[in-house]
């Protein structure tokens, strides 16, 4: 029985590396996979999933307007797919997450989604919130803070390395823009949002 999986973490934990390795494992055994990634994230080039350690693969892109169920159903028309992999899943709309659930439930194809859990303000992305609600299984891909603790948060920083606490939820960037931290160091860097107004 197929399942919807959500593999989540903060920035620079190796989500894309894990996705690419899992897809490779299927393909090595003669099974086809279908890779998708968000059109908004062009850091590796449009329609490409790449990891910081240098591996990559071509992928179909989705925009917020796309019907991902239809995209996957159409791909299945070209031949069997053992598993669907979705990178940058935080950029899925809630409706698209429901469409992925339909792929699992109606087409009996496993879907493994990989994405960020929270943004730089500590808020859930809408796609991630819906994945947390609907996924059959969730797995945390771990990375570490500068202090050695598990990093669960991310800060956005300016060119001088100062934390930015306001702005649009989505701003594409890499190591120069975002830093993964434990909650304690995130609170210190952002001015402890929980203490505001007290």
From Swiss-Prot:
Q: Where does the record place it?
A: Cytoplasm
Q: Which HAMAP family match?
A: Thymidine_kinase (MF_00124)
User: What reaction does this enzyme carry out catalytically?
Assistant: thymidine + ATP = dTMP + ADP + H(+)
Describe the subunit structure.
Homotetramer.
One GO cellular component term: cytosol
Annotated active site: 88
- What domain of life is recorded for the organism? Bacteria
Say yes or no: keyword Metal-binding present: yes
**Which taxonomic lineage is given here?**
Bacteria, Pseudomonadati, Pseudomonadota, Alphaproteobacteria, Rhodobacterales
Short name of any one Pfam family annotated for the protein: TK
What InterPro entries does this protein's entry cite?
Answer: P-loop_NTPase, Thymidine_kinase, Thymidine_kinase_CS
Annotated binding of Zn(2+), by residue? 145, 147, 182, 185
Give a yes or no for keyword Zinc in this entry. Answer: yes
Q: Which GO terms describe its molecular function?
A: ATP binding; thymidine kinase activity; zinc ion binding
Q: What is this protein called?
A: Thymidine kinase
Query: Which sites bind ATP?
Result: 9-16, 87-90
Q: Which GO terms describe its biological process?
A: DNA biosynthetic process; thymidine metabolic process
UniProt family annotation? Belongs to the thymidine kinase family.
The alphabetical list of record keywords is:
ATP-binding, Cytoplasm, DNA synthesis, Kinase, Metal-binding, Nucleotide-binding, Transferase, Zinc
Q: Which organism is it from?
A: Ruegeria pomeroyi (strain ATCC 700808 / DSM 15171 / DSS-3)
User: Under which EC number(s) is this enzyme classified?
Assistant: 2.7.1.21
């Amino acid at each position: 029985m197929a399942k919807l999986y959500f593999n989540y973490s903060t920035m620079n934990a190796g989500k894309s590396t894990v996705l690419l390795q899992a897809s490779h494992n299927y393909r090595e055994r003669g099974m086809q996979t279908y890779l998708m990634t968000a059109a908004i994230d062009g850091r590796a080039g449009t329609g490409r999933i790449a990891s910081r350690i240098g591996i990559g693969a071509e992928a179909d892109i989705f925009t917020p307007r796309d019907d991902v169920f239809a995209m996957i159903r159409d791909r299945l028309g070209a031949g069997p797919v053992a598993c669907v992999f979705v990178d940058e899943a935080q950029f899925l709309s809630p409706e698209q997450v429901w469409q992925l659930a339909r792929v699992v439930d109606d087409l009996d194809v496993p879907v493994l989604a990989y994405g960020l859990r929270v943004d730089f303000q500590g808020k859930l992305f809408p796609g991630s919130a819906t994945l947390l609600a609907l996924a059959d299984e969730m797995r945390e891909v771990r990375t570490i803070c500068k202090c050695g603790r598990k990093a669960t948060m991310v800060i956005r920083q300016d060119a001088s390395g100062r934390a930015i606490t306001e702005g649009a939820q989505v701003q594409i960037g890499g190591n120069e823009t975002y830093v993964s931290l434990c909650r304690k160091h995130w609170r210190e860097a952002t001015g402890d949002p929980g203490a505001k107004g007290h």
